[in-house]
Amino acid sequence: MRVLVITADDYGYWPSYNKGILDAIEMGAVDCVSAMVEREYCVPEPLLESGAEIGLHIEFEGRWGPRSGAPAKTALRVQLERFGDLFGRWPSFLNGHKHCHARPELATPVFQTAQQIGAPVRSVNPDHRQWLRERGIDTPDLLIGRMESRQPAEPPELRNPPQGITEWMVHPGHRDKDSGSSYDRARQEDLAVLQKIMLRARYDEPVWGDARRSTLKAAFSQETAES
């Protein structure tokens, strides 16, 4: 089984980034969206109407710097409750802004929350993947996508995803220098790559090999049914 899940991060960060994510959903280029529920621009209605699967994009940066220990657990609980208030349900999956959810001092409260609500968690490397699976948490087999703007917007693994569930992390958006994001230009590049890929797919070019597109929830449901 080869499955590709395309996840757009940072919904709620900035209005023009929200627009880019919604545009990517409309063109059929995104399956899942990670929402930043503590941000003032996390408006639920357009995302709910889009039909995309919605997860929680956890933030552990407080006013005075990174949170850990009891403050981190409190921050996660508050964000989980806020997600429920906004979207009327639990998140379908969990991941973290700048992969904060994978930091050793923060991984445990994230795993405990995932266990509580029955949600998969994004794994950022093989060690993190093994750690989650040892605790019974579903996680994709591979994460692709760039963390820095100098990396290629179209990952080479996309042409031939390996067996299992591959998650492609993207940050589509329309540029806006007022956002304050150091990744501003790269968001426009990500959106352009998604547009290009969907155009190629429209003409039956095998842009992701023989992988099947899916949401995370559906991918793990099928995996369970087949095992």
Where are these regions (language model features)?
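His/Cys-centered metal/cofactor-coordination and adjacent catalytic loops
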Residues: 10
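Active-site pocket-lining segments that scaffold enzyme catalytic pockets across diverse folds
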Residues: 101-103
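Terminal accessory/targeting
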Residues: 1-6, 15-59, 64-93, 105-227
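Active-site histidine-anchored catalytic micro-motif
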Residues: 95-98
